[in-house]
Amino acid sequence: MLKATRKQADPYKSKLKVSASHSGPHPLPVEVTAAEEEQAATFGQTSPQKLSLKGSQLGGSILIGNYNYLTQLEVCENEMEVLDLSSLAQLETLKCSRNKLMELIINGTNLQTLVADHNYLHNISTTNTHPVPLKLQRIDISHNNFSELPNWVGACASLTAINASHNRLNNVAVLLRNYRITELVSLDLAYNDLKQLDQFPEGFSSIRSLQLQSNELPSLPDNFFAVTHARLETLNVSCNKLSTLPRYEQNNHAALVNLSLAGNHLNDSIFEPLHNAAKLRVLHLAYNRIGVLPAACVRNWPELEILVLSGNMLQQLPEEVATLGQLRVLRCCNNLLLCTPQLAKLAMLKVLDLSHNHLDRVNLLALVPSRNLKYLDLSGNLQLQVDEQQFKVCQSQSQRHWSLVDVSGNNRAALPTTKIRQVSAQRNQNKTSGPWTMGFAETPGSGDCRKLSVYQLRAANYGGSDEALYGMFEALEGRGRAAQEMSHLVPDLMKQEQMVKDSAVRDYMKFTLLAAQQQCGSVRSAALFHLTRTRAPSKVRPLKSKRYVLRMASTGGLDAYLIRRTSQLRLTKPDVIQKDQIHSMPDPHVLELILSNDDEYLVVGNAQLWSVMDIDRAAREIRKEENSLLAAKRLVDIAQSFAAAESLSVIVVRFRHLGTDVDHLIRELKQSVRKKPQPVSLPLSSGSVCKRTCCDRSNACRHRAIEQEPLAGRSSPSGQSDRDLLAKDKDDEFVLAHARVLQEEQQLEMLDETESVSESVLSEEQFKCWEYMLEQNTQLLFDKELNTISKSFTKQRTVPNAIMAATVLPERNDFTSNLMRTVTNKFISTSTPQLPQPITTSVPLGSYHQVKQAPPGHFGSALSFQQAHSYGYNLFDAKPRPKFHGGTVKRSAGPNSAYFGSLQRLMPYNFEYDFAVTQERERNILDEEEHDDDDFNEHESRMRKYWGVATTEL
């Protein structure tokens, strides 16, 4: 083989001269120097037959001509945009992968192999003399932009393999209607947009492997099994929209060995065409709507080795499952199982997953095989009871140490032997109150189930409830112990690095990984993620200090993505190993990112996961599960149905409640104002069954259909505008509820970035103004109105004895003071006020009058408004204000005081008072507050700047 390459040391002595034109109409051809001609002549050749230009930095338009004897050409990993090979009539093998090709012209006279994956091609042109490459045997055009296959593909009679995955194909009519292929063995159309398949021609009977996963197919052709049953061994139709399989009554000698139907809408009717698939070894039926596994089918699958039934509605497994002597992997998580067969008879069973079912009691002696079982998962069965004596007997029979893994995050070291309802209730409470929840899944390769090659670090409470540390370490071949030791050593190392004050904030992550590799040895890949709270003040909203930050350090091929509401962000860099890094520790990639309400999930996976699944598919699957553990398990099951054969490891962190204290207050306000939807019973259609329990899966459950009443009209902050502006249909109100909440939270975050908001329709603008007032001026408005009340008491000539007696009442806590404790205390406590009630029924005119009625419903906590009694707080300038002792008290009226009347009907006070009397008192003391008019005008202009509305004083 004559390999012509370009030396970087001296470009003038290179054997190959290439001229590439980006803009010229006639690109210059590739030429060979005289030295190369002499070398070719010594071998008895007039021109080289094999030419490799891999990684030669070729760009632009390339025209290669005058090479009549060139048979093999490799131009991979360049930056070519146009490649014209129309003059190479003797070319047999062409490899042009990983370029930027948008146009490719080939000569199909003798072409046998065409590999053009990872480009931007949407068509491949041929010459007029040979429009169809009749000798073509293999074509790979995956990872391109094809919307349909080239029109000459179906006429290539010698084709044996077609790979057109990861394109934009919406149909393959060109291939099926003009089908002249006689020996096609493999067809890969996965990861496209196929919505329909026409009837298969008779020539399709030769196919053995058909990949159709991750498409939009609602059904397979009616003659599918009639044509393919004799030779088809591998069929993958996972993640489509199949509801049934085509029937074929004469399918007595089906050749199917590997069948993947995960992630569809299949029901119990699919087992009829699979009844006689006696050669079946691998069956993936996860995440469908299967309720019963027929015992007759199980008896006809004696060679079954892998059976995956996760995410269905199975209530029991047939006893015939215990007769599958070759079964190695059985996954039935996320079902409705109440009992299990005696699986201890399965001597070859190595992986058993029965998690997230309804199991209450398990007989380990009848369930667990004594010797070969490597992984047993019984987590998620909330009422599960295990006999501790049975556990000890099984452990002694296996003569091995059993490692217990608690997936709940409580780090329990023992099996649950009794029902613990309190722990379950506390666990559910933690799920709703924490800033994030974590789920993980890991499994060995399907070929070798002996050990894991990827180890995880899961420290959910690393430094407290709002701090976590996660990591993933992939071992080198035969060095799994180094990765395992690193996962145990990293937490202590990072605490030591955090104590170093001289280094940068995020450098402790980098040095932690380097120190771990120095002590434990090198690993193939490593990734470390630290979630913690930052208290850096915001520039626009000073109170918005409760922020969370994600810090990451990674090396190798582990990939991590941050899934947001409308996009996905890759956190790790592509794995590029340089020559100087082969025998040295690579420099970790460090990243620091402030989390926001738009961030939904953090997904970390090893290279095997991302080799069969992209982030778009992963995000789509994760959003189908509310439980983070089930989301991680779903990714692993889907990846295995996509033919992932090696070890898989996934960590899924679901973010929620990442907002600030003010955001939490606003969220609680919205929940108290809006009427909560009440569940209603709807008539169930035939076959509609609750797919999962309500705690695990709520998105597809028909029993959770709810209806919400329309909001009571509040079209303006003052509540005095027309209510018809907010009138909506009940169904529309519930359907758009989630989108409306997301939009409101996004508007809260926009206040950190800008000080201007675009104009909108009247009702939306008024709602924004009301929301802004609640967020920015809640504290200010409480102080202002309570000060007004206190001043009115101090100006009265006669004070009832009952009220004066209230001054000696004890304080409720250190941060709250009684309203009438002292006359000089002009600024009242900001906690929820509790005014004393007068004993006498006669109340003087102008004094405080309290109406006895049931207090309105509370929202949130009084701690949301508490501050020290010595200081007030101004939300506009973020500065504490000192307490005045005597003299004229400065009025604490904000720019939104005009809307305080409307707020009174929403704020859940513990007292009520007459608004007319309050307004009369306010007019009587205006002479003391004239010097605050300038401040009020300034704030009023600011309100106009933000929202374009005018304010009026009450």
UniProtKB/Swiss-Prot annotation:
EC id: 3.1.3.16
Q: Which Gene3D superfamilies match?
A: PPM-type phosphatase domain, Ribonuclease Inhibitor
- List GO BP terms, alphabetically: apoptotic process; intracellular signal transduction; protein dephosphorylation; regulation of apoptotic process
Annotated catalysed reactions: O-phospho-L-seryl-[protein] + H2O = L-seryl-[protein] + phosphate; O-phospho-L-threonyl-[protein] + H2O = L-threonyl-[protein] + phosphate
PROSITE patterns (UniProt xref): LRR, PPM_2
Q: Which SMART domains match?
A: LRR_BAC, LRR_TYP
| Record field: transmembrane | none
Please explain the role this protein plays, according to its UniProt record: Protein phosphatase that specifically mediates dephosphorylation of 'Ser-586' of Akt1, a protein that regulates the balance between cell survival and apoptosis through a cascade that primarily alters the function of transcription factors that regulate pro- and antiapoptotic genes. Dephosphorylation of 'Ser-586' of Akt1 triggers apoptosis and suppression of tumor growth.
Indicate what this protein is called per its UniProt record.
Protein phosphatase PHLPP-like protein
Q: Which organism is it from?
A: Drosophila melanogaster (Fruit fly)
